[in-house]
Amino acid sequence: MPFSDFVLALKDNPYFGAGFGLVGVGTALAMARKGAQLGLVAFRRHYMITLEVPARDRSYAWLLSWLTRHSTRTQHLSVETSYLQHESGRISTKFEFIPSPGNHFIWYQGKWIRVERNRDMQMVDLQTGTPWESVTFTALGTDRKVFFNILEEARALALQQEEGKTVMYTAVGSEWRTFGYPRRRRPLDSVVLQQGLADRIVKDIREFIDNPKWYIDRGIPYRRGYLLYGPPGCGKSSFITALAGELEHSICLLSLTDSSLSDDRLNHLLSVAPQQSLVLLEDVDAAFLSRDLAVENPIKYQGLGRLTFSGLLNALDGVASTEARIVFMTTNYIDRLDPALIRPGRVDLKEYVGYCSHWQLTQMFQRFYPGQAPSLAENFAEHVLKATSEISPAQVQGYFMLYKNDPMGAVHNIESLR
């Protein structure tokens, strides 16, 4: 059979015609679908703007809080429970509803914005065990200003929630994370130290903060180290907390006895510490003692973690040490510290925070019992120092708590302080 006759036979065959038509329709639909996909990709690439924020970014928590204010019509929600402490000391529970993982739409500044919250169950945070998350914002147009506005609004909202409070950070892995909820700022005058001590430290640290150019012009590293030493319970940590509130700084708590802390991790943590923060190394004597003592008894005075003594020294004042940093160290036993750790450059100001003086006792009495005659405070201080020459502010405060509304009882029962 000639080929032309074969083609005519197929053409006249109704089954073949129907099959060919189906193939043609299927091909056309497949091409249309592919074209629509390519068109959608091109449209999203050239006419839409996308912002992805991973969970480890600091703005992630800000944006989730911001979404609770702008997604009131969302029906699929997750809950975050927090505890709020009032000025009176009463604690109440607060529930915040945030969009659950999935797609949501919000109306913002005259345009619809698609919010996609993703949760990857295959990846978890090794420190907390929570799944890895990210949130993606998508909007029509190519103007990034809408995302800048969202981030600025979220940041302002977060700062508003932290206004008048001190934020605590703790080291988790290779980053700093907020520790608990922001605390009310403690007034600086609520911590009564020896006369003039608080003023000296505040004056020194304010001069440092206000004069970065002075350090730069003279080629001096722009960092400052402080050491507060003295008996326990005398107000070293309390003063640093109050000082952070006075300066409107946060506090970064770093434990040198952490078994996972290494030289590299310490260097990294100091280099990425949040802006406007005080890095606090408490009880440094517990981590590293004098090298002379270590030679005498290497097992007893061996460092608890992987952090080496030379690594700590280099992190505080080495080639790789960071600038624009304020470090506070505290210890109960300064004689146990290696001289290399507290030399100038690593520790610029050392202050002894000791037992209560006569002036401190009168000031504490007047603060706890305002309106009482100054002579009563003087009488209290004299009798306390006669009863004992070594008494810490923590002991005095605990004693005052027994006589909250009874100043005369506090004066007449001093013998119990012995």
Curated annotation (Swiss-Prot):
The annotated consequence of gene deletion is: Mice show phenotypes similar to the human GRACILE syndrome caused by defects in respiratory in mitochondrial respiratory chain complex III assembly. After three weeks of age, mice develop growth failure, hepatic glycogen depletion, steatosis, fibrosis, and cirrhosis, as well as tubulopathy, lactacidosis and short lifespan.
Q: Which UniProt keywords apply?
A: ATP-binding, Chaperone, Hydrolase, Membrane, Mitochondrion, Mitochondrion inner membrane, Nucleotide-binding, Phosphoprotein, Transmembrane, Transmembrane helix
Location(s) in or outside the cell? Mitochondrion inner membrane
Domain of life of the native organism? Eukaryota
Under the heading PROSITE patterns, the entry gives: AAA (PS00674)
Question: Which residue windows are transmembrane per the record?
Answer: 16-32
Membrane-side (Mitochondrial intermembrane) residue stretches: 2-15
Q: How does it sit in the membrane?
A: Single-pass membrane protein
- Which residues bind ATP per the record? G230, P231, P232, G233, C234, G235, K236, S237
What terms describe the molecular function in GO for this protein? ATP binding; ATP hydrolysis activity; mitochondrial protein-transporting ATPase activity
What family is this?
Answer: Belongs to the AAA ATPase family. BCS1 subfamily.
* Subunit (UniProt): Interacts with LETM1.
Task performed by this protein = Chaperone necessary for the incorporation of Rieske iron-sulfur protein UQCRFS1 into the mitochondrial respiratory chain complex III. Plays an important role in the maintenance of mitochondrial tubular networks, respiratory chain assembly and formation of the LETM1 complex.
Q: What is this protein called?
A: Mitochondrial chaperone BCS1
Q: Which organism is it from?
A: Mus musculus
